[in-house]
Amino acid sequence: MRHGIAHRKLNRTHSHRKAMLANMAASLIEHEQIVTTLPKAKELGPFVDKLITLAKRGDVHGRRQAMSKVRNEDQVKKLFDTLGGRYSERDGGYTRVLKAGFRHGDNAPMAVIELVDRDPSAKGAADRARLEEEGGMTEE
């Protein structure tokens, strides 16, 4: 029976999985969009959603809880100072997972995970130029 099985193992030990999710969450908070494999993206979404919910609370205890999960002081600061306010009116669903084809080396399914209502200025200059060229997300 498949009772009480909540998360994917991702072929890693518990400590490796925990460290990987912390690193990926820090990268997602910093860049607001990352490319990874589909199972990792699906696992990262709820993890980051819970962190943003802590940031919306904005108290010291929430900041300490986020720090214990992310282990990156700069990203926790951005999480609480920027993202908590940005999503104050939204009840959940802070991340979006988009399928992005297959990786050439091993044909692994890839995905883009991004924050909803993300800031395009958080991306690099090359990405901004490409977005403007495609007529996609423009800065307001």
Curated annotation (Swiss-Prot):
GO terms for molecular function: structural constituent of ribosome. Pfam families: Ribosomal_L17. InterPro entries: Ribosomal_bL17 (IPR000456), Ribosomal_bL17_CS (IPR047859), Ribosomal_bL17_sf (IPR036373). PROSITE patterns: RIBOSOMAL_L17. Residues 119-133 have a biased composition (Basic and acidic residues). Disulfide bonds: none annotated. Residues 119-140 are annotated as: Disordered. GO terms for biological process: translation. GO terms for cellular component: cytosolic large ribosomal subunit. Keywords: Ribonucleoprotein, Ribosomal protein. Part of the 50S ribosomal subunit. Contacts protein L32. Belongs to the bacterial ribosomal protein bL17 family. This is Large ribosomal subunit protein bL17. It comes from Maricaulis maris (strain MCS10).
